[in-house]
Amino acid sequence: WSRLSTAVTIAADNAAVQLQNSWEELMTRLEPEPEPAEDIQLVDSEEVAPPPRPIASFSITTLICRNSQEYLTGGARELFYYNQTADLWAEGLYGTDSISGYGCGPTAMAMVVSTLTGTPIDPVQMSQHCVDNGYWARRQGSYRTIVQGVAEDFGLVCESLSLEDQDDISRRLATGQLVVALMGPGHFTNGGHFIVLRGVTLDGSILVADPASSDRSLTTWELDLILEELSASRHSGGPLWAVSAPF
C-alpha cells in the first residue's frame, strides 16, 4: 500500500507539472501579436556586416571608460554609451525577449536619458521601464512611441524633425541635442534599428551611437546616407526625433 501511495503521488505531481507547462505554452500562443504593424520597430535577428569605412580619428571621437562606465567623445558632449550585446545585459530580458536581440530601443533611450539627465540608467532598467509603460512589442522590438514616451517620462523635451531640413538637424546636434533615428535596411540593419545621432564634425559628418556596434559608433557618417536609410514609416513622429533637456 505504501508503494502504491508513493507511485500515485509521483504520478499526480508529474501530471500537475505537465498541465502547468501545457497551460503556459497555450497562453503564450494565444497572446496577441502587437498591432498595428506600422507602429512597430520590426527588428531583424541577422547581424549587419561591419561598415565599409575606417574608424574615425582619435581626435574626432573615441570610446573611453571611466569608473566602469563607457562614454563616446566628440560632438557637443560626451555620451553615455551602452551596447545591447554587452555581457552585462545581453541575456537580460526585454519582456520575454532578450535585450541583445530586441533591445535596441531601450538601449538607445538609456543612452539618451543618462546623457541628458546626468543620472545613469542602464539597458536592463530601461527595458523594464519600457515594458511597464507599454513600449515593448513582443518578438518585434519596440513600439515607436518609445522615443517620445520615454523622453517625457524622464522630463525631457521630444520633437519630431523634418527630413527635408538638414541644416536644422546639424544645428541641433551642434548645440548638444540628441537625435534618435529609426533606421531601415542598409548599413545599420537588415530590418529596423534605433540609433542615436550624437554630434556633427567640422566637415559636416555625423557622429552616431549604435547600441549594437561600437565600431559603427566610432565611424563618421554622411547625413545624406543616414536620411536615405531611415525607416520609411512616418508613425509616432518618426523616424527622426530630437531630444533635449528642458530649459
Where are these regions (language model features)?
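Active-site-adjacent substructure of cysteine-protease-like catalytic cores
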Residues: 157-207, 227, 242-246
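Extracytoplasmic/periplasmic, Sec-exported soluble proteins
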Residues: 96-105, 118, 135, 139-143, ...
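Solvent-exposed loop/turn segments at secondary-structure junctions
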Residues: 87-88, 111, 120, 135-137, ...
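Active-site-adjacent structural segments surrounding the nucleophilic cysteine of cysteine proteases
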Residues: 1-136
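Noncatalytic regulatory segments and standalone regulatory/sensor domains
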Residues: 69, 200-247
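Extracytoplasmic/secreted envelope proteins and their assembly/folding machinery
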Residues: 105-113, 123-127, 144-151, 166, ...
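Short, well-ordered alpha-helical segments in soluble proteins
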Residues: 108, 112-116, 154, 173, ...
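Mid-length scaffold segments of soluble, non-membrane domains
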Residues: 120-123, 127-164, 174
